[in-house]
Amino acid sequence: MAKKLFTSESVTEGHPDKICDQISDAILDAIFAKDPNARVACETSVTTGLVLVSGEITTNCYVDIPSTVRQTIREIGYTRAKYGFDADTCAVLTSIGEQSADIALGVDRALEAKNGEMSEEEIEAIGAGDQGMMFGYATNETESYMPLAIDLAHRLARRLSEVRKSDILDYLRPDGKTQVTVEYEDNRPVRIDTIVISTQHHPEATQERIRRDLLEHVVFPVVPSELLDESTRYFINPTGRFVIGGPQGDAGLTGRKIIVDTYGGMARHGGGAFSGKDPTKVDRSAAYAARYVAKNVVAAGLAERCEIQLAYAIGVAQPVSVLVETFGTAKIDEEKIGELVKNNFDLRPAGIIKTLNLRRPIYRQTAAYGHFGRTDLDLPWEKTDKAAALREQAGL
């Protein structure tokens, strides 16, 4: 039996980089609530006592960005100056411009439309907002069709915030990280080898109490007991102290947790971040579409694991390439799966936006604890509504 260990991490909503992701997406949502056709590329940076919001936004509506920033920080839990960062006293600076006219030219009217290659109906198609490649992944090793390590890391991080906000563990503070190492035998998860949790805390909380409480209230309620054994290792605040955290401890930036946002390193990544971007940016929308395709392929039973690569040219609606990789787990020929994908999914940016109904204020909720496998949310790219048709067309 081939054994191997695989590790993924997650972070809480109070992590500096995740604060930035949530602010960027909160601004996007606030704009989309008033102007669904807005173009938004919003970047955020945080450090001790300071938030800087910059980027390019083209819209016909007004949004109070400083108020949106402060409300987001308040909801995360930075509400006291003693935490080193406070929603009411931090400075908020903004530097916003409009989308480049050259980029808008390519997005507004796709290259195929300008060349007269599309029907009147298809002229509505939007050209890709940039070049690049995006990946989507799914596996049948969990009910969420996500790799087990990242699935558990997210659930632990979310639980860490829950016990803080509900005052079950009232000495916890917003910043925190989790990490899970899974042991695989013949590519199937069999046990948890290591769990790491680091959480910001009140200076008077002892290491012994933190360890005992986190095992009782976070680890054991989340991780299935059959995956734990006497050899499982637990590292709880392994430095021994985590009082200085959040933006006081580390500066944060939007888009710095792209592996946490996706598949925990189990799948490849094209390099583009999600938060703060409207769906004409294929970095976001095509990555969601690739997950949608991969999940439906696996849910249909066409493969046990599936990775989809999509690639685009700026201003061109049709993807320049679509690749299906099943890692030797396909039940039918991979080329046949590729044909089914092309026949059942519209992977032009306009097609993705329409299919997944992406011009809505749904993004802030995705900006912490992962964009995929979210059983706690009703996200359109997580639906398996194409699985039955794929299975029937595959003859299974």
Curated annotation (Swiss-Prot):
Residues that bind L-methionine: 56, 99, 250, 281
Q: Which domain of life, per UniProt?
A: Bacteria
**Which keywords does the record carry?**
ATP-binding, Cytoplasm, Magnesium, Metal-binding, Nucleotide-binding, One-carbon metabolism, Potassium, Transferase
Q: In which pathway does it act?
A: Amino-acid biosynthesis; S-adenosyl-L-methionine biosynthesis; S-adenosyl-L-methionine from L-methionine: step 1/1
Its EC number is 2.5.1.6
Pfam families membership: S-AdoMet_synt_C, S-AdoMet_synt_M, S-AdoMet_synt_N
One GO cellular component term? cytoplasm
UniProt cofactor(s): Mg(2+); K(+)
Q: Would I find Phosphoprotein among this entry's keywords?
A: no
Protein's UniProt keywords contain ATP-binding:
yes
**Alphabetized GO MF terms:** ATP binding; magnesium ion binding; methionine adenosyltransferase activity
Q: InterPro entries of this UniProt entry?
A: ADOMET_SYNTHASE_CS, S-AdoMet_synt_C, S-AdoMet_synt_central, S-AdoMet_synt_N, S-AdoMet_synthetase, S-AdoMet_synthetase_sfam
Matching entries from Gene3D superfamilies are given as: 3.30.300.10
**Location of the region described as Flexible loop in the Swiss-Prot/TrEMBL record:** 99-109
Predominant localisation class = cytoplasm
Q: Where does K(+) bind?
A: 43
GO BP annotation list: one-carbon metabolic process; S-adenosylmethionine biosynthetic process
Reaction(s) catalysed (UniProt annotation)? L-methionine + ATP + H2O = S-adenosyl-L-methionine + phosphate + diphosphate
Q: Which residues bind ATP?
A: 15, 175-177, 241-242, 250, 256-257, 273, 277
Q: Which family does it belong to?
A: Belongs to the AdoMet synthase family.
Quaternary structure annotation from Swiss-Prot or TrEMBL: Homotetramer; dimer of dimers.
Any idea what job this protein has?
Catalyzes the formation of S-adenosylmethionine (AdoMet) from methionine and ATP. The overall synthetic reaction is composed of two sequential steps, AdoMet formation and the subsequent tripolyphosphate hydrolysis which occurs prior to release of AdoMet from the enzyme.
Stated name of the protein: S-adenosylmethionine synthase
Source organism of this protein record: Desulfitobacterium hafniense (strain DSM 10664 / DCB-2)
**What's the gene?**
metK
